[in-house]
Structure formats: C-alpha cells, structure tokens
C-alpha cells in the first residue's frame, strides 16, 4: 500500500523560481490548447468539469491553508478528501474557493468543523507549513502541479501516473 502525503504549496512562487508562467501570461496557442486538453481529460476520466470555471484564476492560498489545517487536525487522508472536494467545487460546481463562506461550506459538507478549520488555517503555524512546503518544492525542482515524488524522483502531471505506478512496481 502506498501512502500519499499531500503538501500544498504556493505555485506562484514555484513558477517564479522555475521559469513557469501563470496562465494569463502564456502564449495564446498554449492557452487554447490547455482548454482542449482539459476537455479531453474530463471526457477520458468521465469527470464533469467546466474547462473555464467562473472563479478561475483565483488565489488558491486560503484553500491550500485549509487543506494544511485539516491535515494537522485530522490527518492526511482527511486532507486528501478535502482537497478533492475543493477541486470539485471549483472545476465542477463553479464555486469560489477563495471565499471563506464557500470554504466553510465545503469543509462542513466533508463532516468537518468548517468555521474552526478556517480559523486554524489563518494561524502562523499553518502559514509556516505552507511556506515550508513551498520552499521544499522549490528545492526539489518542482515546476508544476500535480507533482509526485517517489524515492526522490519527481513525476509531473496526471498523465505521468503510469510511470509512477511502474516505479512502485519496480521496487
């Protein structure tokens, strides 16, 4: 059994350190192709998705800190489930994941104390973990998300999961 440890980080800092560009600064061809790829992945995975959600781009910091607060309070599995719920809220349900009331609702729907979790997410300890995760990502040469590390080797993107699985099986 493989344990997945989620480490939310500030992608704007990761992009700045790795030469990546935020979506709005990418060439029009890349922006257009991204929409095609998002629809392909939505169809392939049979996951409903708005490829241009109403609230995107949006600052991910409050949601990232909420996930870290959940991880501290309830463990990694709860944090992973909350992360999935937050992504679904943005990409499928067109919710604003930078909005405090929205985040409280998402957490409550996941059987968590949303108000307490949002309060915890605003602490210096959680911000410290967020900054540490970001610094660790930069030090590990992360340049995008999702990013997986197995035995010190990085794998970028959901389309690399087969390679990650092969690495698990190679032992």
Predicted regions and their residues:
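Structural alpha/beta surface segment adjacent to cysteine/selenocysteine redox centers
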Residues: 1-90
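C-terminal cap of thioredoxin/glutaredoxin-like
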Residues: 1-7, 72, 81, 85-171
């Amino acid at each position: 059994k493989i344990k997945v440890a989620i480490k939310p980080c500030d992608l704007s800092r990761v992009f700045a350190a790795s030469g990546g560009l935020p979506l709005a600064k990418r060439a029009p061809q890349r922006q257009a192709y991204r929409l095609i790829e998002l629809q392909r992945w939505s169809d392939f995975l049979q996951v409903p998705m708005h490829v241009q959600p109403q609230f995107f781009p949006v600052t991910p910091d409050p949601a990232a800190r909420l996930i870290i607060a959940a991880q501290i309070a309830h463990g990694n599995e709860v944090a992973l489930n909350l992360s999935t719920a937050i992504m679904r809220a943005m990409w499928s349900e067109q919710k604003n994941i930078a909005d405090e009331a929205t985040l409280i609702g998402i957490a409550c729907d996941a059987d968590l104390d949303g108000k307490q979790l949002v309060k915890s997410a605003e602490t210096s300890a959680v911000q410290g973990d967020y900054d540490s995760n970001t610094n660790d990502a930069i030090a590990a040469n992360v340049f995008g998300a999702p990013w997986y590390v197995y035995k010190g080797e990085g794998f970028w993107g959901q389309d690399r999961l087969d390679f990650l699985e092969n690495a698990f099986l190679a032992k």
